[in-house]
From Swiss-Prot:
Gene: lipB
Identification of the protein by name: Octanoyltransferase
Keyword list, A-Z: Acyltransferase, Cytoplasm, Transferase
Function: Catalyzes the transfer of endogenously produced octanoic acid from octanoyl-acyl-carrier-protein onto the lipoyl domains of lipoate-dependent enzymes. Lipoyl-ACP can also act as a substrate although octanoyl-ACP is likely to be the physiological substrate.
Places the protein is found: Cytoplasm
Additional detail: In the reaction, the free carboxyl group of octanoic acid is attached via an amide linkage to the epsilon-amino group of a specific lysine residue of lipoyl domains of lipoate-dependent enzymes.
Source organism: Rickettsia prowazekii (strain Madrid E)
Family: Belongs to the LipB family.
Length: 209
C-alpha cells in the first residue's frame, strides 16, 4: 500500500517543491517507494507552464512562484488540501500514459466528493473537477497540474475545502473567471481536514493499486 505523508503546519511552497523534487530523484535513482504528500500551503500564487502574465491581476502581498507543472495560475492557501502523488508510471502495475494518469486522478477526486453527496463533473478541454452551481453554471472545486520526470509523477491536485475564495480574485485561475471557483464550505459541507484525508486515502487505494 502506498504511504501517505501529511506535512504538518502551513508549508512554504518552495520548500515543498524542493522536497518533492528530491524525492522524485530518489525514486528514479534509488528505487525509493511511491508516496503521496498531503499539504496545506501558506498563501501563494503559482504559475504553470501555460500561464499568461495578464492573468495575474492584483497579487498584493501574496508571493508569485513560477513552476514547472502544467496549467496556468492558481492559488494555494489555508483551507485547501493539496495532494502530491509521487508515483512511478514505469512500474509493471502502472502505465506510461500521462492522459490515463490524469484520468485516474479525476476519477479519484470525483469518487471522494461523492462521499459528501457532491457530484463532480469533467468539462471538455478544461482540466479539473467541476460542480454544478446556480443556474446551471459550473464552478471548479479541484485544480490539477502535474509533471513527470522519467515517468515519475509530481505536483498534483488542489481541492478547496474551506479556502478563502476571495484570494482567487488576484488572478484569473486556470484562465477562468474567479467567480467560477467553489469550495466544500461554500457548498454547505463542513469537514475537518483530517476526516477528508481519510476519505481520499480510502478512494485512492481503490484506483491506484
Amino acid at each position: 500500500m502506498i504511504r501517505f505523508i501529511t506535512l504538518q503546519n502551513l508549508m512554504d511552497y518552495q520548500v515543498t517543491l524542493k522536497l518533492m523534487e528530491d524525492y522524485v530523484n530518489k525514486v528514479i535513482n534509488d528505487n525509493e517507494p511511491e508516496i503521496v504528500y498531503l499539504v496545506e500551503h501558506s498563501e501563494v500564487y503559482t504559475a504553470g507552464t501555460n500561464y499568461k502574465q495578464e492573468e495575474l491581476l492584483n497579487y498584493d502581498d501574496i508571493p508569485v512562484i513560477y513552476t514547472g507543472r502544467g496549467g496556468k495560475f492558481t492559488f494555494h492557501g489555508p483551507g485547501q488540501r493539496v495532494i502530491y502523488p509521487i508515483l512511478n508510471l514505469a512500474l509493471p502495475n502502472r502505465h506510461k500514459d500521462l492522459k490515463l494518469y490524469i484520468k485516474m486522478l479525476e476519477e479519484w477526486i470525483i469518487n471522494s466528493l461523492n462521499y459528501f453527496g457532491i457530484k463532480g463533473y469533467l468539462i471538455k478541454d478544461k482540466v479539473g473537477i467541476w460542480i454544478k452551481v446556480n443556474k446551471g453554471e459550473f464552478a471548479k472545486i479541484a485544480a490539477i497540474g502535474v509533471r513527470v520526470r522519467k515517468w515519475v509523477t509530481y505536483h498534483g491536485i488542489a481541492i478547496n475545502i474551506s479556502t478563502d475564495l476571495c484570494k482567487f480574485n488576484g488572478i484569473i485561475p486556470c484562465g477562468l473567471e474567479s467567480s467560477l471557483v467553489t469550495s466544500l464550505n461554500q457548498l454547505g459541507i463542513y469537514v475537518e481536514m483530517s476526516e477528508f484525508d481519510k476519505i481520499i486515502q480510502t478512494e485512492f487505494n481503490k484506483i491506484f493499486k
